[in-house]
């Protein structure tokens, strides 16, 4: 059975950014994820959200969001998987370090990766990617 957009998964930075911009589809998707099994993000996405803050108010909002979110770390196995993918796909597909780390976090945790940028990940063997909206 193919995973649906309500299956537990890791949420990519692009969807989180949409939610901070109050995009209704992103907010509805995050609400469904939270209700179903909670929201999971990579520490890389948490850092990207933090780096995107323009002021103390936005930073506080991001911190409050992350307090209610499971933030998955970069483990040794995540690092090794990401490094292998970088070696295999950087030159041919332009795979970037943050994308490799986020994808490897999802892969190693056995989770679907939810992203609007499915083309960034389509070459990665064994990774399940869904565009949720």
What are these regions (language model features)?
Residues 1-41, 51-63:
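Short, well-structured N-terminal submotif of metal-dependent ribonuclease cores
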Residues 2-7, 69-116:
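Active-site neighborhoods of divalent-metal-dependent phosphate/nucleic-acid chemistry enzymes
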Residues 12-13, 49, 82, 106, ...:
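Generic structural signal for small/hydrophobic residues in well-ordered secondary structure
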Residues 15-16, 45, 78, 101-102, ...:
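Alpha-helix capping/helix-boundary segments
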Residues 16-17, 47-50, 122, 130:
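Nucleotide phosphate-binding site architecture
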